[in-house]
Amino acid sequence: MGPPWSQESSPEERLPTEWSRQLTRARWVLLAVLLCGLLLGSSMLWFYIFRNCGPCPCETPVCMELLDHYLASGNRSVAPCTDFFSFACEKANGTSDSFQALTEENKSRLWRLLEAPGSWHLGSGEEKAFQFYNSCMDTDAIEASGSGPLIQIIEELGGWNITGNWTSLDFNQNLRLLMSQYGHFPFFRAYLRPHPAPPHTPIIQIDQPEFDILLQQEQEQKVYAQILREYVTYLNRLGTLLGSNPQEAQQHASWSIVFTSRLFQFLRPQQQQQAQDKLFHVVTIDELQEMAPAIDWLSCLQAIFTPMSLNSSQTLVVHDLDYLRNMSQLVEEGLLNHRESIQSYMILGLVDTLSPALDTKFQEARRELIQELRKLKERPPLPAYPRWMKCVEQTGAFFEPTLAALFVREAFGPSIQSAAMELFAEIKDAVIIRLKKLSWISEETQKEALNKLAQLQVEMGAPKRAVKPDIATQEYNDIQLGPSFLQSFLSCVRSLRARNVQSFLQPFPYHRWQKSPWEVNAYYSISDHMVVFPAGLLQPPFFHPGYPRAVNFGAAGSIMAHELLHIFYQLLLPGGCPACDTHVLQEALLCLERHYAAFPLPSISSFNGSHTLLENAADIGGVAIAFQAYSKRIVEHTGELTLPNLDLSPYQLFFRSYAQVMCRGLSSQDPQDPHSPPSLRVHGPLSNTPDFAKHFHCPRGTLLNPSARCKLW
């Protein structure tokens, strides 16, 4: 007899067990149905949320203003996949210029601040700035003074045959006065700048003078004679304004232009000097005295850079030694045989330099010259600027710390600065991620690059010194305003030069911004290892805390990423990264050059792809990095906004905002600009960004979705 658990059960005894199993199966089926229903319901709920509660339209006043700006500047009838530049920038009356429009808006803001009534402490920086501005705007007083204040200055320089008796003074004495007291540098320029080589300590640098007739393109050589004739006409007009008869004025103008032409023949293009390794010469004052003896270098430089203590063993950086040698020989020859020609050249040049502070007759003569030169060079005429804009620019040049403080208080408050710094931090993090993924960079170079990025300084809004009114007041103690506007102007010129010298004499010289805080231009300073983003740039339509994040990342974020990539530009130069995979790097750079060369350009463009290569690389990398940062942000944070009535998703709005920054007419571009023409600054980076084609659904093979792309950053 077996064990009890082995006994068989009858059919009747097995019935409850089978019923129990069927019931369990039914329960599982019911549970599965319920779970499927729950999942389906959840999916529908999430679909509803994302469809109806996804990106919300931003309808605040700042967003509606931005919307109006976008609608007015773009041409929505253009297919974005074939011409995104026109889609974003081509308004009905021509291509809009975002940088120029914002620049003018910032100046208008300064104008309103300077026109507003206020009471200032006696002798404060604000009081002197407002007094100078009001003096500049007092055109009745300037017209009443006429050429009297200018003739008085000419008499201090020994006079001139045109304005009265001429007493031939010591040449170097006159030259010292011209440069140190009146800001006119007829034969060379001298300035303090960081040394071009590390550790970038401040050093006096000597460079060519600036000429109105400087030729930049081969086509200008054909109209050289016409340019000279226009310049003679201008100088002749200056002479008659100073009281000369037409024949005498013509003679002095001819003498001056002959001397100018001979100096001009000694100039060499910067690219040529660089190719011949002649752009930087380190010499002592003594050595320069031997090479160019017509100039008393020690006394002249001492006068310019007072209160610096100089001696004959002081080192200088000379940028064109051959020019200085030839200039010295020409001056010596002129002092022996054509002394009056040199005096005419120096005096007429001084009048030209001081024309912004003279009455309208002098300013109109200057303006007509510029317009004629632009016409001969096939460039569009300059628009007529109102008097208030000129006075704002002059006040800003001389009283920058004071106007910077006013502008920042008005346009770049703590909340805006905090939002801008937060954006910069996210862009910087995206750059770090990029550096870690580069295929052509070595591990050692990667560590160096990351360390360099970690040590980077950043300044936003305005220099820290600029917002301290007590410092500004001390800096303006030496300014004496009046009795004439010309005298006020010259007092400010001398004060500004003295402040520049003093800043370099500090034990730890602070970084002097290369741009005013209201300017629309960011930059990277190699000598200070610092990126600077002025308050004037971080304004609508480029940036605002209340904008959709897509706008801020696409516009300001791309600019920030662009400047951060300039930190590593040396890696892209030949021999700049010996530890890198140079084959992969060079292939990427060649790809980039071919990529830009493939785009059609208007016939008026003189684009040189190799000349703009580094900026093109920063443009392409800047957009990619900013988009990477934005994509990360949109995943990690909810509540995305977009602009109504544009029919653009947040990702599409990112690219639209980037293009908006680049809106500019081709004719407004400087021939020496290291950037590509505006349309290429849009099409080049966006066509190299697969996400653009993805989000705008561009068919393969269209302009903005090419079959091949370049991989650099």
Curated annotation (Swiss-Prot):
CDD domains referenced in this protein's UniProt entry, alphabetically: M13
Recorded family membership: Belongs to the peptidase M13 family.
Residues the record lists as binding Zn(2+): H562, H566, E615
Matches recorded under InterPro entries: MetalloPept_cat_dom_sf, Peptidase_M13, Peptidase_M13_C, Peptidase_M13_dom_2, Peptidase_M13_N
Subcellular location: Cell membrane
Subunit structure: Heterodimer with XK; disulfide-linked.
Name of the featured protein: Kell blood group glycoprotein homolog
GO molecular function: endopeptidase activity; metal ion binding; metalloendopeptidase activity; metallopeptidase activity
Organism: Mus musculus (Mouse)
Free-text description of this protein's post-translational modifications in UniProt: N-glycosylated.
Function (record text): Zinc endopeptidase with endothelin-3-converting enzyme activity. Cleaves EDN1, EDN2 and EDN3.
Cofactor binding note: Binds 1 zinc ion per subunit.
